[in-house]
A protein has these predicted regions:
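Short secondary-structure boundary/capping segments
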Residues: 16-17, 48, 104-106, 128-130, ...
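Residues at the C-termini of beta-strands that transition into short coil/loop
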Residues: 9, 29, 88-90, 117-119, ...
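A contiguous loop/helix-start segment that scaffolds small-molecule binding in enzyme catalytic cores
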Residues: 41, 51-56, 69, 73-75, ...
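Short, well-ordered alpha-helical microsegments
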Residues: 12-15, 93, 123, 146-147
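Class I SAM-dependent methyltransferase SAM-binding "motif I" and its flanking Rossmann-like core
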Residues: 61-134
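Class I S-adenosyl-L-methionine
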Residues: 1-87, 95
Length: 168
């Protein structure tokens, strides 16, 4: 039903085939460590697009409510009295771990989950949570910083034999 779809890099492009034939597609994907569209520009695009289109879909991949700038975009639409509806999907942390048979929590093993980002870790120290054998760490955007991240975890008391899964 959408007149326009504003979509990100992480969205499966096959989803766009479900749109009506005259739908307008606007790509606003961000690529790590490359020049990309700034969030302020995306926010303005949300406002500008609604002037010419009655039904807009903001299609985001990953988990928008976890390091995905959901708050910034909601402030723009709600602050401009634009009606919206959020239709959540499966979180990337929950979906990817379940698909790979990795429980985030497990009786007697992991009683807590911490979500954090390692995106800035290449340039600065990121404070990691205190070591706990009963905690699962879900570290988003950590591929580039993986060697530094592992070293920091070991330096903070995690065993070098701690099980990790890298999902990209």
């Amino acid at each position: 039903e959408a007149d326009a779809v504003i979509y990100d890099r992480l969205v499966n492009p096959l989803l766009l085939f479900y749109c009506k034939p005259d739908c307008v597609f606007i790509y606003v994907g961000k690529t790590p460590y490359q020049s990309s569209m700034q969030q302020e520009t995306i926010n303005q695009l949300l406002l500008d697009t609604q002037k010419n289109h009655s039904k807009i879909v903001r299609l985001k991949g990953g988990t928008p409510e976890i390091f995905g700038r959901l708050t910034e975009e909601l402030e723009v639409v709600s602050g401009n009295n634009i009606a919206f509806e959020i239709i959540p999907g499966v979180s990337s942390a929950g979906g990817s771990t379940a698909y790979n048979g990795i429980p985030l929590t497990e009786r007697g093993q992991a009683r807590a989950v911490t979500f954090m980002t390692a995106h800035l870790m290449m340039n600065e120290e990121v404070l990691l949570p205190e070591h706990s054998a009963e905690q699962t760490l879900c570290i988003y955007m950590g591929i580039e910083a993986l060697p530094k991240l592992i070293l920091q975890l070991v330096n903070q008391g995690f065993s070098a034999n701690t099980k990790i899964a890298v999902i990209s």
